[in-house]
């Protein structure tokens, strides 16, 4: 017998969300009661735009560092295959507003303060596709996203 599985992100109506936003996807509890929160960090409007791979890859590496500098409990921040944003997985309970503030602050630093030397994991030893990075694109996208404002509500614009 095949187990029925529903993947929440495929149930989301991508035509009614209003990016950029942070959305709480789920809170799950492990066998010992540990809480994990999963967020949809949507940076660009689905089916209207996508971030090219090199820019997204550099944003991914920078967020891995910058988010951890701003909030405890980050497990992982992985890009969506559609290249419109990231899954952010956290230990503990966090609100969409708190995460949106962290993302905004991180993107502001990417847009204005980061140099190539600040990007972690860009060598052949530390990255599985080290030649596919673009700090220029990461900075451009970060500024575009900041200019639009990041909402803590995916369906109505509530910019933080």
UniProtKB/Swiss-Prot annotation:
Protein EC: 4.4.1.21
Residues binding Fe cation, per UniProt: 57, 61, 127
Complexes and interactors: Homodimer.
Function statement: Involved in the synthesis of autoinducer 2 (AI-2) which is secreted by bacteria and is used to communicate both the cell density and the metabolic potential of the environment. The regulation of gene expression in response to changes in cell density is called quorum sensing. Catalyzes the transformation of S-ribosylhomocysteine (RHC) to homocysteine (HC) and 4,5-dihydroxy-2,3-pentadione (DPD).
A Pfam family: LuxS
Molecular function via GO: iron ion binding; S-ribosylhomocysteine lyase activity
InterPro entries linked to this entry: LuxS_sf (IPR037005), Metalloenz_LuxS/M16 (IPR011249), S-ribosylhomocysteinase (IPR003815)
Catalyzed chemical reaction(s): S-(5-deoxy-D-ribos-5-yl)-L-homocysteine = (S)-4,5-dihydroxypentane-2,3-dione + L-homocysteine
Top enzyme class: lyase
Cofactor(s) this protein cannot do without: Fe cation
Similarity comment: Belongs to the LuxS family.
Identification of the protein by name: S-ribosylhomocysteine lyase
Cofactor note: Binds 1 Fe cation per subunit.
Alphabetized UniProt keyword annotations: Autoinducer synthesis, Iron, Lyase, Metal-binding, Quorum sensing
A Gene Ontology biological process term: quorum sensing
């Amino acid at each position: 017998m095949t187990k029925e599985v529903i993947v929440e992100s495929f149930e989301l109506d991508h035509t009614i969300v209003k990016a950029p936003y942070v959305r709480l996807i789920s809170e799950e509890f492990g066998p010992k009661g540990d809480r994990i929160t999963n967020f949809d960090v949507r940076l660009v409007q689905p089916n209207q735009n996508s971030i090219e791979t090199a820019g997204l890859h550099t944003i991914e590496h920078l967020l891995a560092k910058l988010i951890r500098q701003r909030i405890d409990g980050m497990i992982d921040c992985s890009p969506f295959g559609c290249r419109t944003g990231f899954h952010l997985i956290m230990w503990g309970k966090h609100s969409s507003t708190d995460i949106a503030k962290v993302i905004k602050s991180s993107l502001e630093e990417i847009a204005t303060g980061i140099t190539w030397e600040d990007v972690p994991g860009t060598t052949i030893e530390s990255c599985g596709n080290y030649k596919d990075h673009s700090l220029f694109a990461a900075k451009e996208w970060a500024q575009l996203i900041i200019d639009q404002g990041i909402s803590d509500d995916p369906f109505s614009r509530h910019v933080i």
